[in-house]
A protein has these predicted regions:
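Transmembrane-lumen/periplasm boundary regions of multi-pass, lipid-linked membrane glycan transferases
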Residues: 21, 26, 59-69, 73, ...
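Membrane-interface transmembrane helices that cradle and orient dolichyl/undecaprenyl
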Residues: 9, 140, 175-191
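Extracytosolic helix-loop segments that constitute the early lumenal/periplasmic catalytic or substrate-binding loops
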Residues: 62-106
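Transmembrane-helix signature of polytopic, membrane-embedded enzymes
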Residues: 40-45, 129-151
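Membrane-interface alpha helices of multi-pass inner-membrane proteins
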Residues: 190-205
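Short acidic/glycine- and proline-prone juxtamembrane loop motifs at membrane-interface regions
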Residues: 154, 160-167, 206-207
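Start-transfer (signal-anchor) and selected internal transmembrane alpha helices
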Residues: 1-49, 235-243
Length: 263
């Protein structure tokens, strides 16, 4: 019986390697060819604007000290402690400070390491806003919305500081994106995901995160394709319950932890 030698696959040509390199940068088949390159270029420009001079940026010293303390102790990290002894907590929930503390734990205490999370959050917000608007109004409208957000002066300012607004905005835009997906499909799962995002936003800026709830709920009640209003109301109620559970999770956990004295 003749033995047929295995034929090694031909090495990829330069053209095929180039096509594979370009694939992530090309728009999906259902979008114009210019959509993804334009979005990525805009995100890159936003990133440059946000990081420009961030090593010498002014930061809030109170929250900077808290993030540093939290980066040095997991106990302080969990409880959002301001001081290394873990006796004083900050004046809000520590959602954004958790992200900053992780950055400091990885890179060390530097101003740029303190601001880096907000830069990333700002760029992600631009990308997610594009997707949310594109779902309902198309790529051109999505790109316009993303461009306006990217160049708004307050967006640049927040992305170059260490306050918690950047994380709040990102999470609420993620909630809006999930709600837009629910509007198109009537998906309860997407609406529950929106509730999770709002609950996480509560960890960043507390009750301010809930200000978006009436608009998100009204949009789903009025425009979702679910056949019966009763069904849509039930979906909104479940999403509200998820939001409440996620929002109150950290406060509940901290409240249930006994004090050192056991009292």
């Amino acid at each position: 019986m003749a033995i047929i030698p295995e034929i090694a696959p031909a090495p990829a040509s330069g053209a095929s390697r180039w096509r594979r390199f370009l694939t992530p940068w090309r728009s999906p088949a259902d979008q114009p060819a210019w959509a993804r390159p334009a979005l990525l270029a805009m995100a890159a420009l936003a990133a440059v604007a946000y990081v420009w001079g961030m090593a010498g940026a002014n930061v809030e010293p109170f929250y900077g000290a808290a993030a540093r303390s939290m980066s040095q102790s997991w106990h302080d990290f969990i409880f959002g402690a301001f001081d290394p002894a873990g006796t004083v907590t900050v004046d809000k929930l520590p959602g954004e400070l958790w992200v900053q503390a992780l950055s400091l734990r990885i890179f060390g205490f530097h101003i740029w390491a303190l601001i880096l999370p907000q830069v990333i959050e700002g760029v992600l917000t631009v990308l997610v806003l594009y997707r949310a608007v594109r779902r309902l109004a198309g790529p051109a409208a999505g790109l316009t919305a993303a461009a306006v957000l990217a160049v708004t002066p307050v967006t640049v300012l927040l992305s170059r500081g260490n306050v918690s607004d950047s994380l709040l905005i990102l999470l609420l835009v993620l909630a809006a994106d999930a709600t837009c997906a629910a509007l198109l499909t009537g998906s309860l799962r997407q609406l529950l995901i929106a509730g999770v995002w709002v609950g996480l936003a509560f960890q960043a800026k507390m009750i301010q995160a809930w200000l978006a709830l009436p608009a998100l709920a009204a949009a789903y009640l009025l425009a979702a394709p679910a056949a019966r209003l009763r069904t849509r109301c039930a979906h909104v109620a479940l999403a509200g319950l998820v939001t409440a559970v996620v929002s109150l999770s950290w406060m509940t956990a901290v409240t249930l932890v006994p004090s050192h004295g056991g009292g």
